[in-house]
Amino acid sequence: MHIKELLSTTRMIPVLTINNLNDTLPLCAALMAGGLSVIEITLRTKPALNAVEMISKELPEINVGVGTLLDPMDLIRAKNSGACFAVSPGLNMDLVEQAQKDNLAYLPGIQTSSEAMTAYRYGLRALKFFPAKAAGGIYGLKQFQPVYPDLEFCPTGGIDFSDAPEYLRERNVLCVGGSFASPSDLIEQQNWKEITRLATMAASL
C-alpha cells in the first residue's frame, strides 16, 4: 500500500516504544479495539523488531510500521520483520532509495522548504512534519500549503488531544502521530482499558 493511501485510513498514528515484549499484543489489541489500526513502533529499544514481527504474525489486521530509522540497514531489518511502512525522523536519500528498491512505503521527516523540495524531487508526496511543535507547529505547517499544494503531512512531535483537532483541520494534513493515546505510564500499568478509551477518542478526532 502506498504511504499516502495508508495514512488516509487513520486520523492518528500511535507512536509506541516497546520496553517489554510481553506488552506488545495486549497494547496493540487495546489500540485496535479503540479504532486505531495503523501503528508505529520506534526502533529505540531491543524488543522493537521482535514486537513488529509478533504484530505482523499475530495481528495481521494492524498496519505496523517501524520508526526512528537512521540508515538503510534499519529499513532492511524493518521490512524483514514484517513492517508494512517505514518512518524516519529526517530526510535521508539513502533511505529513500532503499525504500524504493524494496518497495516499502516510506514516510521521511522534514522541517524546511529545502527538505520538502528534495523530497518532492524524489517523488515523495506524503511527509512527516517533525518535530511539529518545535518546527513552528500549525503556523509552520501552513507555510508549505501555497508553495507545495500537493504535499501532505503527518505532523508528529509535541501534539496531544488539545491541539490535534486544529492540525487535522488543515487541508495538507492526512493524520497526526504521537503517544497521547498510549502514554508510557498506562503501558507500564498495563491499563489496556484506559488505552482503549483514549484510542477511541483519538480515532474520532
Locations of the language-model features?
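Conserved N-terminal beta1-alpha1 strand-loop-helix module at the mouth
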Residues: 1-81, 101, 161-162, 169, ...
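Glycine-enriched alpha-helix->loop->beta-strand junction motifs that scaffold or abut catalytic
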Residues: 32-37, 58-61, 80-86, 100-107, ...
